Curated annotation (Swiss-Prot):
Family stated for the protein in its record: Belongs to the eIF-2B alpha/beta/delta subunits family. MtnA subfamily.
Source organism superkingdom: Eukaryota
Family annotation (InterPro entries): IF-2B-related, IF-M1Pi, IF_2B-like_C, Initiation_fac_2B_a/b/d, M1Pi_N, NagB/RpiA_transferase-like
N-acetylserine sites (modified residues): S2
Native organism: Saccharomyces cerevisiae (strain JAY291)
Site (Transition state stabilizer): C181
EC number: 5.3.1.23
Keyword RNA-binding: no
Quaternary structure and partners: Homodimer.
Reaction(s) catalysed (UniProt annotation): 5-(methylsulfanyl)-alpha-D-ribose 1-phosphate = 5-(methylsulfanyl)-D-ribulose 1-phosphate
UniProt keywords, alphabetically: Acetylation, Amino-acid biosynthesis, Cytoplasm, Isomerase, Methionine biosynthesis, Nucleus, Phosphoprotein
Protein's name according to its UniProt entry: Methylthioribose-1-phosphate isomerase
Active site: D280 (proton donor)
GO cellular component: cytoplasm; nucleus
């Protein structure tokens, strides 16, 4: 990708630099927001300038690292006044409270919770601020590197599994897939989770096409030929972000509205064989919290006999919560649902309208009466009964003969 969601300069251990891409301005404007403190991390997560469970965990962890380095090197900074730096026990107490505050930015995303628990453990075992800084730096670097490696594994695991299933079913033609929200490079350290599987399927398709064109392999076999990303209201992560990534990678795709899924499945010239979605939290029985609209997609896939897969690293699995009934679902500000935010364009030719500084102008357009009541949950819960497989870096987990997932090996 030409755009990185997170820019982390780790060249200087004692003076790291962190910037995150303001994804609210995509696809027309590229602007990075610097992260110096936990407050900065909280702000970009809460406002959804950064989103995607893996990316949220990474940015949250990085914001802790930048704050720790700031108070260590600049004890007169504003944020340093929150701490009693002469007393390590007092400093740890304040840091623990700051970590709890950071978690409140996105309570549904278990990756952030898991990362902050790990950071609290590092804090507990650290003898002083310098030791904590060094251990935290190593943890964050490992978190980022492992996320990218695991994304590649998930992509290949999911692609191979679907191709094998289709071959066993005797399907040998071109097929399409569905996806919702954004689960690609912009939601992770790179490559993506659900969109990573789609990238791997596209690589497989290109390789098969090359072999066929060169005469090395004339046998018909299943290959992905098209992707249908859902727009994903009300924040339009599908139209703003996933569509951007698909266009950049030159993967054949057609954007569809959330309300047109069933009709698209019924009328698609290319048979739709699977849906791949990400996850913000997967509990012990496989129930999954993900972007609002995921449950609707799962129900429709069940109706049409389309395979429905959740793609997430094992860090997204909550080994404490038994069922989805106990997941806390964040509700967004009702006002967000009454407007559409975007870049202003010239209606005659589609060109961007720029301000005096030459930057694209963004604005909000009201789409609902201000007096109307609004229910605006950020997520919904898909019961495990509607999920055909959970794709992780460890492999693809399917249900047993009793219709239950057995995820204990991932805990």
């Amino acid at each position: 990708m030409s755009l990185e969601a997170i820019v982390f300069d780790r060249s200087e251990l004692e003076n790291v630099s962190v910037k995150v891409l303001d994804q609210l301005l995509l696809p027309y404007t590229t602007k990075y927001v610097p992260i110096h403190t936990i407050d900065d991390g909280y702000s970009v997560i809460k406002s959804m300038q950064v989103r995607g469970a893996p990316a949220i965990a990474i940015v949250g962890s990085l914001s802790v690292l930048t704050e720790v380095q700031l108070i260590k090197h600049n004890p007169t900074s504003d944020v340093a006044t929150l701490y009693s730096l002469v007393n390590w026990e007092s400093t740890k107490t304040v840091l623990n409270k700051r970590l709890d505050f950071l978690l409140s930015s996105r309570p549904t995303a278990v990756n952030l919770s898991n990362s902050l628990v790990e950071i609290k453990n590092i804090l507990k075992s650290s003898s002083d601020l310098k030791a904590f800084d060094g251990s935290l730096y190593n943890y964050v670097c490992e978190l980022i590197d492992e996320d990218l490696a695991n994304n590649m594994k998930m992509g290949d695991n999911g692609a191979k599994y679907l191709i094998d299933v289709l071959q066993k079913d005797g399907f040998k033609d071109e097929f399409a897939v569905l996806t919702i929200c954004n689960t690609g490079s912009l939601a992770t350290s790179g490559y993506g989770t659900a969109l990573g599987v789609i990238r791997s399927l596209w690589k497989d398709s290109l390789a098969k096409t090359d072999k066929a064109d060169s005469g090395l392999d004339n046998e018909k076999c299943p290959r992905m030929g098209h992707v249908f990303p859902l727009e994903t209201r009300p924040y339009n992560q599908g139209s703003r972000l996933t569509a951007y990534e698909l266009v950049y990678d030159k993967i054949p795709s057609t954007l569809i509205t959330d309300s047109s899924i069933a009709y698209r499945i019924r009328t698609s010239p290319i048979p739709i064989k699977a849906a791949f979605v990400g996850a913000d939290r997967i509990v012990r029985n496989g129930d999954t919290a993900n972007k609002i609209g995921t449950l609707q997609l799962a129900v429709i896939c069940k109706q049409f006999g389309i395979k429905f897969f959740v793609v997430a690293p094992k860090t997204t699995i909550d080994n404490v919560t038994e069922t989805g009934d106990d997941i806390i679902v964040e509700e967004r500000n009702p006002e967000e649902f009454k407007v559409v935010t975007g870049t202003v364009i010239n209606p005659e030719n589609g060109s961007l309208i720029l301000n005096e500084s030459g930057e694209p102008i963004t604005g909000k357009v009201g789409i609902a009466p201000l007096e109307i009541n609004v229910w605006n949950p950020a997520f919904d819960i898909t019961p495990h009964e509607l999920i055909d497989g959970i794709i992780t870096e460890e492999g693809v987990f399917t249900k047993n003969s009793s219709g239950e997932f057995q995820l204990e090996s991932l805990f």
